[in-house]
């Protein structure tokens, strides 16, 4: 059995509900939601938490529109690929959009949205590696850089609540147990989304550069390929997903995720 291990919870990318521009006359609302298993459930759970719908008992992080037990507002749901949600906003009344897709579309999840997840969300983004690599010097160095105050300050300043740092007691960016001289000249490769993951990693890159370590950031726009290149050994780590997605990926692909936090 292949294994990918989550080694670090860095930030929560808030899920938010944005108003669309549809001019249609209808007694019902149309809301676009992500069509992948974990983010659709995430959207439905947010709508339930805000009182728009009620899900069947037991429906959790795998919920779909078929699990809606009560729909008092007669909402119609359009299931859309997550990356395309900003593009369909003009055709629906509302859309539930992940921050990593909202921000590049010039949508501010804090200022422009009607509803937004809080920092207690269980969908915090993690750094994942292939099992056996979670305690290698390179990964420990990357982990320390991402857990730094410099990264936390960047997240809080840059995204103003759209992305929330969840690292407790951020440090100086360095692991006192590591021999950084031995790491000098080495390269760490990480798969990431363009926004915000690659931007956050760019700050970690500056920290690692102080010790002569190169951080190579490989940008991806889909969720699947980053895990594939980590599993194959082409890339050291993946910083582009949350635990519920990894659990679903595990079920579909025979991988197994073990959190070490």
Give the predicted meaning of each segment:
Residues 41-44, 48, 138, 146-167:
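Periplasmic-binding protein-like
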């Amino acid at each position: 059995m292949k294994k990918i291990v989550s080694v670090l919870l860095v930030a929560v990318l808030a899920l938010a509900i944005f108003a669309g521009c549809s001019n249609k006359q209808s007694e019902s609302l149309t809301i676009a939601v992500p069509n992948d298993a974990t983010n659709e459930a995430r959207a439905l759970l947010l709508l339930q938490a805000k009182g728009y719908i009620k899900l069947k008992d037991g429906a959790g992080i795998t919920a779909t529109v078929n699990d809606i037990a009560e729909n008092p507002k007669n909402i119609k749901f359009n299931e859309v690929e997550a990356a395309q949600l900003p593009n369909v906003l003009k055709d629906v009344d509302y859309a539930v959009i992940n921050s990593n897709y909202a921000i590049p579309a010039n949508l501010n999840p804090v200022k422009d949205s009607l509803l937004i997840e809080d920092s207690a969300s269980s969908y915090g983004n993690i750094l994942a590696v292939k099992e056996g690599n979670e305690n290698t010097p390179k990964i420990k160095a990357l982990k320390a850089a991402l857990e730094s105050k410099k990264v936390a300050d960047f997240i809080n300043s840059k995204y103003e609540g759209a992305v929330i740092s969840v690292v407790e007691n951020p440090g100086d960016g360095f692991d006192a147990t590591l021999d950084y001289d031995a790491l000098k000249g080495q390269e760490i490769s990480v798969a990431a989304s363009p926004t915000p993951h690659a931007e956050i990693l760019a700050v970690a890159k500056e920290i690692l550069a102080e010790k002569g370590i190169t951080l190579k950031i490989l940008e991806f726009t889909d969720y699947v390929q980053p895990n594939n290149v980590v599993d194959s050994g082409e890339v050291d780590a993946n910083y582009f997903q949350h635990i519920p997605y990894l659990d679903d990926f595990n079920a579909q692909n025979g991988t197994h995720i073990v959190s070490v936090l």
